[in-house]
């Protein structure tokens, strides 16, 4: 199976970081980051997209699994950026876990 080009995750994350610093009233990301509900709004979206992904898997709908998983990952990136968690930190944690599994 060919390896996916995951640089899109970095590009999307960078756009989210830019929206965090540079407010644009037309930006969905800005609306999420500055919502009156605060972090709860972002948490609601992550929860909503998680449930929709689960339902797509339960329904064995490949197209919907891809679509809802993309929504979930996007909203998770917003959540990470809002909490100053970098993709490098996530990659480092995953690498450390992978190395530990190889040793066990």
UniProtKB/Swiss-Prot annotation:
PANTHER family in UniProt: HISTIDINE BIOSYNTHESIS BIFUNCTIONAL PROTEIN, HISTIDINE BIOSYNTHESIS BIFUNCTIONAL PROTEIN HISIE
InterPro entries per UniProt: HisE, PRib-ATP_PPHydrolase-like
Assigned GO CC terms: cytoplasm
Single GO term (MF): phosphoribosyl-ATP diphosphatase activity
Encoding gene (name): hisE
Pathway linked to the protein: Amino-acid biosynthesis; L-histidine biosynthesis; L-histidine from 5-phospho-alpha-D-ribose 1-diphosphate: step 2/9
CDD domains membership: NTP-PPase_HisIE_like (cd11534)
EC id: 3.6.1.31
EC primary class: hydrolase
Catalytic activity from the UniProt record: 1-(5-phospho-beta-D-ribosyl)-ATP + H2O = 1-(5-phospho-beta-D-ribosyl)-5'-AMP + diphosphate + H(+)
Protein name: Phosphoribosyl-ATP pyrophosphatase
Keywords, comma-separated and alphabetical: Amino-acid biosynthesis, ATP-binding, Cytoplasm, Histidine biosynthesis, Hydrolase, Nucleotide-binding
Example GO biological process: L-histidine biosynthetic process
Subcellular location: Cytoplasm
UniProt record similarity statement: Belongs to the PRA-PH family.
One Pfam short name: PRA-PH
Chief location: cytoplasm
């Amino acid at each position: 199976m060919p390896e996916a080009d995951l640089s899109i995750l970095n590009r999307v994350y960078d756009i989210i970081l830019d929206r965090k610093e540079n407010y644009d009233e037309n930006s969905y990301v800005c609306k999420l980051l500055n919502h009156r509900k605060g972090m709860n709004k972002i948490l609601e979206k992550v929860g909503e997209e998680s449930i929709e992904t689960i339902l797509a898997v339960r329904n064995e709908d490949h197209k919907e699994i891809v679509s809802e998983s993309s929504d979930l990952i996007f909203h998770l990136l917003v959540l990470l950026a809002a909490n100053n968690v970098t993709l490098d930190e996530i990659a480092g944690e995953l690498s450390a876990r992978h190395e530990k599994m190889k040793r066990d």
